[in-house]
Amino acid sequence: MHADTATRQHWMSVLAHSQPAELAARLNALNITADYEVIRAAETGLVQIQARMGGTGERFFAGDATLTRAAVRLTDGTLGYSWVQGRDKQHAERCALIDALMQQSRHFQNLSETLIAPLDADRMARIAARQAEVNASRVDFFTMVRGDNA
């Protein structure tokens, strides 16, 4: 099975943003076993975070972030990759394994419904909760025209 680029980007993003303990628990509950070899052992490094002034202005480097990457190959030759923020090497390897399994038609539907969709829903709930927390303390400023400034 060959997933289109946008679909693969979506599941890789969901995996990268997932909570390591939650991903491990959900994957273990599925009882999926797969023989694979590690092509690139999980390794940790730094990446520079780029931003833009006002979202559209000149690019600048906002700082550094720790990133861990991994690559695995299933026995049938399917390659799986992952890049996750932080230093959790097991999480990176687990994400790479799931990426490889998601590319196989026999696992795609099951993993999409029982792993990727719930992880995505959990992430959206975390984002919504954080947004609600921020909105609760939001202050909207406005300017009133005074009589002497009119």
From Swiss-Prot:
Belongs to the PhnG family. GO terms for biological process: organic phosphonate catabolic process; organic phosphonate metabolic process; organic phosphonate transport. It holds the Pfam family PhnG. Forms a complex with PhnH, PhnI, PhnJ and PhnK with the suggested composition PhnG(4)H(2)I(2)J(2)K. InterPro entries: Phosphonate_metab_PhnG. Keywords: Transferase. Together with PhnH, PhnI and PhnL is required for the transfer of the ribose triphosphate moiety from ATP to methyl phosphonate. GO terms for molecular function: alpha-D-ribose 1-methylphosphonate 5-triphosphate synthase activity. The gene is phnG. It comes from the Bacteria. GO terms for cellular component: alpha-D-ribose 1-methylphosphonate 5-triphosphate synthase complex; carbon phosphorus lyase complex. It catalyses: methylphosphonate + ATP = alpha-D-ribose 1-methylphosphonate 5-triphosphate + adenine. The sequence shown is that of strain K12. Its EC number is 2.7.8.37. This is Alpha-D-ribose 1-methylphosphonate 5-triphosphate synthase subunit PhnG.
